């Protein structure tokens, strides 16, 4: 989320009063009727209690009150995420994309249930898929390429406790 001292500039705009530019003699710039200000935040402006989003900045309640609509966005549905993954990594086979999406779903459930501390974002999934495709040029089969991609993009960055859980999920899905 934005730095509070920068967000202050937008308070008048969010209240429908236009932008006041004090450096230009107090000139007021009215917003176009179709103007919208959209903000995204992993922490809903509350800061980060988990330590996972260290750059998250808590926002004042006065600032948060100026945003009238809040939308929670979940991960894509498996079918849509599979299509997306195939779109960003076209060399990925349908079966492998489906297998990776199944793993991602299980990984995310484990995260939500508090079994692991490491989430799996679409960026992380894309990294695993890209690593798999590039590794396929170096190894003799898909199983070895997938194990390498999983290890280097997922396992190598997580805690030892998470590794145990994630390796179990991986083994169950990739029998």
What is the predicted function of each stretch?
Residues 1-175:
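C-terminal regulatory/interaction module of P-loop NTP-utilizing enzymes
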């Amino acid at each position: 989320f934005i730095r509070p001292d920068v967000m202050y500039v937008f308070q008048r705009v969010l209240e429908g009063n236009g932008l006041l530019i004090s450096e230009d003699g107090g000139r007021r710039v009215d917003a176009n009727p179709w103007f919208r200000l959209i903000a995204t935040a992993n922490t809903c402006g509350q800061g980060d209690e988990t330590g996972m989003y260290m750059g998250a900045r808590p926002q004042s309640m006065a600032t948060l009150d100026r945003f009238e609509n809040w939308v929670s966005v979940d991960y894509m549905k498996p079918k849509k995420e599979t299509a997306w993954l195939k779109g960003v990594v076209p060399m990925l086979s349908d079966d492998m994309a489906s297998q990776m999406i199944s793993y991602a779903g299980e990984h995310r459930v484990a995260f939500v249930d508090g079994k692991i501390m490491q989430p799996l974002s679409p960026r992380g999934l894309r990294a695993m898929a890209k690593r798999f495709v590039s590794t396929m040029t170096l190894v003799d089969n898909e199983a070895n390429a997938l194990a390498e991609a999983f290890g280097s993009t997922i396992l190598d960055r997580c805690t030892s406790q998470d590794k145990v859980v994630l390796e179990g999920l991986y083994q169950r899905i990739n029998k």
